[in-house]
C-alpha cells in the first residue's frame, strides 16, 4: 500500500469527528459551489460532489436544501478560500485551509493560534511544497473488484486504489478530479463521497511530549469555524 493508504488509515479516527463541525464545513462548501456554478446539481459538478459528501455524514436533506436556497440569494455573501502556512513547535510544517467571509478576522485568529502555541506563521509557499495535493473518491464496492477499478482508472489519473469496510477508495492528483468524477458517473458507479487532501511527502516522528505540543496548535486551528482542513508533517500514532 502507498502513502495515501497509510495517511488515510492514520487520520481516519482523528479528524472531523464532530458532526456539527462537518455540517458547518459542508454548508460553506455548498455556498461556494452554488456561487461558482449555480444551484442545479445536474449542471454543477462541484455541487453534486458536495451533496454526496453531505449524505456521507448523514446531513439532513432539509439542511442541504436550505443551504442551496440561502446560497442562491444574491444577498448571501461568498466565502473566500485562503491557505495559511507555518510551523508548529519541533519543526512540524502546518498547512491550514480556510473558507472565510472576513479575511481580517481569520488572519488574526490563525496568527494568534500559532503565536500562543510557540509556532510561527509563514509566508505563502513556505510549506505547501511539502504536501502532495490529491483528490479522492469513495465508491460503492458492491459488485466491483478494486484491482479492476485500478486498472480501468489509471487512464484517468488514478494512482492508488484500495478498499476498506466503507467501500473502495481512489486516490489521484488534484487535477484529475474532473476526469475521474465524469468517468465514474458515465459508468454509473455510485460515488459515496469525494474530496481533496494534502498528503505530507515526509513525516517526522516526535516524542509523546513533543507531539502534545503540536496537538495543542492543531486543536485550536480545527476548532475555528473558518478552518476547513488542517494538514501537518507529524507522524500520526
Enumerate the language-model features and the residues they cover.
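A short alpha-helix capping/helix-coil boundary motif
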Residues: 27-31, 89-91, 127-130, 159-161, ...
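Short, surface-exposed recognition loops or helix-turn segments adjacent to catalytic cores
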Residues: 123-133, 164-166
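Positively charged, low-complexity, intrinsically disordered RNA-binding extensions
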Residues: 136-237
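N-terminal cationic and glycine-rich segments that engage phosphates or anionic surfaces
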Residues: 1-122, 132-136, 205, 232
Amino acid at each position: 500500500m502507498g502513502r495515501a493508504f497509510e495517511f488515510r488509515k492514520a487520520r481516519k479516527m482523528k479528524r472531523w469527528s464532530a458532526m456539527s463541525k462537518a455540517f458547518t464545513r459542508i454548508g460553506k462548501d455548498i455556498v461556494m459551489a452554488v456561487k461558482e456554478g449555480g444551484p442545479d446539481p445536474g449542471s454543477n459538478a462541484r455541487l453534486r460532489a458536495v451533496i454526496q459528501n453531505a449524505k456521507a455524514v448523514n446531513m439532513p436533506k432539509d439542511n442541504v436544501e436550505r443551504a442551496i436556497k440561502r446560497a442562491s440569494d444574491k444577498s448571501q455573501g461568498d466565502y473566500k478560500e485562503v491557505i495559511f502556512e507555518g510551523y508548529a513547535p519541533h519543526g512540524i510544517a502546518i498547512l491550514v485551509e480556510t473558507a472565510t467571509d472576513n479575511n481580517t478576522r481569520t488572519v488574526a485568529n490563525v496568527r494568534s493560534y500559532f503565536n500562543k502555541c510557540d509556532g510561527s506563521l509563514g509566508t505563502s509557499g513556505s510549506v505547501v511544497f511539502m504536501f502532495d495535493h490529491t483528490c479522492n473518491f469513495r465508491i460503492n464496492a458492491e459488485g466491483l473488484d478494486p484491482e479492476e477499478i485500478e486498472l480501468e482508472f489509471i487512464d484517468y489519473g488514478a494512482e492508488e486504489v484500495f478498499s476498506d469496510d466503507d467501500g473502495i477508495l481512489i486516490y489521484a492528483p488534484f487535477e484529475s478530479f474532473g476526469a475521474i468524477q465524469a468517468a465514474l458517473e458515465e459508468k454509473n458507479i455510485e460515488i459515496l463521497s469525494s474530496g481533496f487532501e494534502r498528503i505530507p511527502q515526509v513525516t517526522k516522528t516526535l516524542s509523546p511530549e513533543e507531539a502534545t505540543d503540536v496537538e495543542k496548535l492543531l486543536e485550536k486551528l480545527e476548532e475555528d469555524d473558518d478552518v476547513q482542513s488542517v494538514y501537518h508533517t507529524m507522524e500520526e500514532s
